[in-house]
């Protein structure tokens, strides 16, 4: 394509924080960096100067200044950032203390709750006092088995304020999946919900907690949050561990205190997906996470105090940690808990009155008690009048207008589902404040870009972003000062020396290869939990190319300075020795109207590898010879004959992780008769049985 899908207006570029940062760097260092390409090149050449500039531009408050920005700059792993510096992560997320909305929590049934920045700080202070009274100290673990709601954010901030390490799972995890994670890190305190809702079902957590608690050694206290319409029965767990009600430990209590902690103080423990064994416990530091998220939110996403940020996520996915850091920019965060395709049982607000209603109702909707649920601004009769209750597929789109969302984050799979459902938000919604759409979880197909600009609005920055739990951030993401090109991630992140290498470790200026990062960055993990000699950590990222981070993505650079991600390296297909990224096939299959979703693997066959494509079809559609021919023709016409699958098989479900990523490796193992080591990591492990002993693959 010769023209970009979107190009920012000059006034939008000039008003962006990215351009302000470019001018800031030029003035400080006497440079003449003219554009993003020059700024990025400087950021990876003068790495220490760049990260110091980020800290200063965003006014990071060091309780003790660093003696040096970067030590052991050539060591990866081994580089040390901001030695001697002290700060507090939670303090930076709570710098704002006024009545501006900090969190808006919306549940599947339509319940809406709101906390201002002042109220959020007071709630954090209350829980902080309780944790301190328990004797929780820096380095202790506080874990949560919670939905994406305001109580979870309060718990994280209270833990971080005193230097405890936060780790969370969503309540839909199976008991063994939770034990596989929390059992390794031995939390001192567990915050858990009494129940939750999903897809219209009310689910009680009592039995799951009863199974989990005896297996968590060192647990001192369980804090139960009433949620999902399930009233907690504390006596059920009191014989196993001290148990208290959330209401009794989280009442507003003035202003929190913040412990000054080293830059590399552990902040989060996140987990690998765990489909190849017990999940790896990835430890992230406070300072590196803060700097990276300030950069990504403030510069790459152009998030500011006037913005409303939404990302569809659960507390078991790194995007929750990423989302919450938006508080450091003073923005309003919209939290959604539940299915994105479940109609609300309560009406949402009228689109046209959303902005004024939020201001007028701020005090009325603020939270003074856990059981005091705020009512929607509009009643059911009014909602029916304006016709705002629409199809289930539009549930999250409704939030854009109802909450005046300016930055809307979701997944490539969700956007594809909207397109398949025929949803055209520009026809049914105003989207007046929407300035950016973010997509991650899997590569956004070229056609997905077309859909967003055709069916949302033409004047927005569509940012397909890519990184991972491993770095709790991104390697490639958006740029509000640059054009958006079809199918491309706009740019490599500032300060991220991202390159594409061949198998021999040579950089590729064109063509597909391994995505690597050749220089250290602050949000590299501190290591893996209980990996004292660092051997597992080193094997995970630095074994393939010593001294260079190999991320495991199959990618290529573009002439515009961006990237295209073709899938995971370990899922690459290799028929006849030709490497094919699975995303290259998925992109074409999405064009077939009858197919809802697909998954491709390479099957060992007669001394070679053959491509097998599994398809999930629309209701009432069968995979006949005509449909098979159509799928093959679309792939052959738009890719190459090598991409055409040898076998196409219809299945009724496709297994995925709890963050929505399809699991090619697990399916490949099942097809080859190999074990899948940790099915508890999957949202729908029962789907694996669909791929076992298939006659067409024998």
How should these model regions be labeled?
Residues 38-42, 103-157, 174-179, 245-247, ...:
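Conserved AMP-binding/adenylate-forming core of the ANL superfamily
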Residues 161-247, 411:
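Structural core segment of the AMP-binding/adenylate-forming
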Residues 288-308, 316-406, 421:
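Conserved AMP-binding/adenylation subdomain of ANL enzymes
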Residues 169, 173-194, 209, 398-401, ...:
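AMP-binding/adenylate-forming catalytic core of the ANL superfamily
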Residues 224, 637-662, 674-698:
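AMP-binding/adenylate-forming catalytic domain of the ANL superfamily
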Residues 299, 401, 435-562, 569-572, ...:
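Conserved AMP-binding/adenylate-forming
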């Amino acid at each position: 394509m010769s023209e970009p899908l979107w190009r920012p207006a000059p006034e939008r570029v000039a008003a962006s924080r990215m351009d302000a940062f470019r001018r800031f760097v030029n003035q400080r260092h006497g440079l003449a960096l003219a554009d993003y390409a020059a700024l990025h090149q400087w950021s990876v050449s003068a790495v220490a100067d760049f990260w110091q500039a980020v800290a200063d531009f965003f006014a990071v408050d060091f309780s003790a200044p660093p003696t040096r920005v970067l030590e052991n700059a050539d060591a990866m792993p081994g580089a040390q950032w901001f030695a001697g510096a002290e700060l507090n992560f939670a303090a930076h997320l709570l710098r704002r203390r006024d009545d501006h909305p900090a969190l808006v929590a919306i549940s599947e049934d339509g319940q809406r709750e709101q906390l201002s920045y002042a109220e959020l700080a007071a709630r954090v202070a209350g829980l902080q006092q309780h944790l301190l009274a328990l004797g929780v100290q820096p380095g202790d673990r506080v874990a949560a088995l919670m939905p994406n709601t305001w109580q979870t954010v309060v718990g994280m901030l209270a833990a971080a304020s005193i230097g405890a390490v936060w780790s969370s799972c969503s309540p839909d995890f199976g008991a063994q999946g939770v034990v596989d994670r929390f059992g390794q890190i031995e939390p001192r305190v567990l915050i858990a919900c009494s129940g939750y809702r999903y897809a219209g079902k009310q689910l009680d957590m009592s039995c799951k907690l009863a199974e989990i608690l005896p297996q968590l050694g060192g647990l001192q206290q369980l804090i139960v949050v009433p949620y999902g319409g399930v009233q907690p029965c504390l006596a059920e767990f009191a014989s196993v561990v001290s148990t208290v009600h959330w209401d009794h430990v989280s009442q507003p209590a003035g202003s929190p205190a913040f412990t000054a902690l080293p830059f590399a103080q552990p902040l989060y423990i996140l987990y690998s997906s765990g489909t190849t064994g017990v999940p790896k416990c990835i430890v992230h530091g406070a300072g590196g996470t803060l700097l990276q998220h300030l950069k990504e939110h403030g510069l790459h996403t152009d998030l500011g105090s006037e913005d409303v940020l939404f990302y569809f996520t659960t507390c078991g996915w790194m995007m929750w940690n990423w989302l919450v850091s938006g508080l450091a920019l003073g923005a309003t965060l919209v939290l959604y808990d539940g299915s994105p395709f479940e109609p609300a049982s309560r009406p949402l607000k009228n689109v046209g009155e959303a902005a004024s209603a939020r201001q007028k109702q701020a005090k009325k909707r603020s939270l003074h008690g856990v059981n005091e649920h705020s009512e929607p601004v509009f009643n059911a009769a009014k909602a029916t009048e304006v016709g705002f209750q629409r199809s289930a597929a539009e549930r999250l789109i409704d939030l854009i207008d109802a909450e005046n969302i300016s930055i809307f984050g979701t997944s490539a799979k969700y956007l594809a589902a909207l397109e398949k459902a025929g949803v055209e938000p520009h026809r049914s919604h105003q989207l007046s404040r929407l300035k950016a759409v973010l997509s991650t979880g899997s590569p956004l197909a070229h056609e997905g870009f077309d859909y967003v600009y055709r069916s949302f609005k033409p004047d927005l920055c569509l940012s397909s972003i890519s990184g991972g739990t491993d770095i709790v951030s991104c390697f490639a993401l958006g740029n509000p000062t640059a054009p958006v090109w079809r199918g491309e991630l706009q740019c490599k992140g500032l300060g991220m020396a991202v390159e594409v290498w061949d198998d021999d470790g040579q950089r590729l200026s064109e063509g597909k290869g391994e995505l690597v990062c050749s220089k250290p960055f602050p949000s590299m993990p501190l290591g893996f939990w209980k990996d004292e000699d660092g051997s597992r950590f080193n094997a995970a990222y630095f074994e393939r190319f010593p001294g260079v981070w190999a991320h495991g993505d199959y990618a290529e650079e573009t002439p515009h300075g961006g990237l295209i991600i073709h899938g995971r390296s370990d899922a690459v297909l290799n028929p006849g020795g030709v490497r094919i990224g699975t995303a290259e096939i998925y992109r074409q299959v999405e064009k077939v109207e009858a197919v809802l979703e697909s998954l491709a693997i390479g099957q060992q066959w007669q001394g070679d590898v053959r491509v097998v494509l599994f398809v999930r079809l629309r209701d009432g559609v069968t995979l006949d010879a005509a449909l098979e021919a159509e799928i093959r023709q679309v792939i052959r016409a738009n890719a190459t004959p090598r991409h055409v699958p040898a076998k196409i098989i219809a299945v009724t479900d496709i297994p995925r992780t709890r963050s929505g990523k399809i699991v090619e490796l697990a399916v490949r193992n099942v097809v080859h008769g190999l074990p899948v080591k940790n099915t508890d990591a999957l949202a729908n492990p029962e789907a694996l049985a669909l791929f076992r002993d298939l006659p067409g693959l024998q």
